[in-house]
Amino acid sequence: MSGSSVPSSPTDWVGPLRRLAPALVLAALTGACSSGPAPTTYDLSAPTSRISGSSGVQVLVAEPAALQTLSTQQIIVKDASGAISFLGGGQWADNLPRLIQTRLINTFENASQIRGVSRPSSGAVADVQLISELRSFEIATPSNEAVVEISVKIVNDSNGRIVNGRIFRARAPVASVDAANAARGLDEALSVAMLDIVRWVSGSRLPRREDPAATASTLPGGEERRDTAGTPPA
């Protein structure tokens, strides 16, 4: 019979397969590159505003707790039935709870109403901690609104007792349900919520760790307390 011959043993296939390998790899890489453009990355902002009142305390801001659907970089859309989907074409600059923690710290710093603010991992000695839960951070349809809801508790860092608690909610209209408009609306709503949180904390009566310099100047038995230089305190 005329025509091309067929390899008769397994070893006869090695040469042709070796010649095909580079072409197969190139085809796979080409397919991966043509899957679509990379999503646009969006950040959240930290608003700046002068806030009256000052608590003068040291605050630690913990990363908000969140359900798995919110512990993501994806932009979430929720319809009237409660069904959740992820909006294509965009993503957040970091895992959402961690990004919100950073921007809330920045908002406190921008307001300049707190003596010091940092993360628990900083090792700073604090008067209180802000423990929070991210409840909602999504685009609601068909109303086309950005919805943000955060539950915040002020906790005495010396004994773990809850000093106060409040739920903060904010909404912002969204022109259309696409990545750019969704990110803009959620950033606007979060800015409102974060400013409300800073005002609330700054205006609250909060516990403070005992300041050694502010303790009584006498020891038990009436002995005068002296500083390290041996002189009575001023």
Predicted regions and their residues:
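Sec-dependent bacterial lipoprotein signal peptides
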Residues: M1-G31
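Surface-exposed short loop/turn segments
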Residues: S34-S52, N106, A111-R161, A175, ...
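Short secondary-structure boundary motifs at beta->alpha junctions and helix caps
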Residues: G82-Q91, S158-R199
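Extracytoplasmic/secreted envelope proteins and their assembly/folding machinery
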Residues: P97, Q101, I105, A111, ...
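Solvent-exposed amphipathic alpha-helical surface segments
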Residues: A111, R115, I197-W200, S204, ...
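Juxtamembrane/interfacial segments around transmembrane helices
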Residues: A66, L70-Q73, V152-I154, A180-R184
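Generic short beta-strand segments
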Residues: P64, E133-F137, R169-A170
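A structural "domain/chain start" motif
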Residues: C33-P97, A126, S204-A234
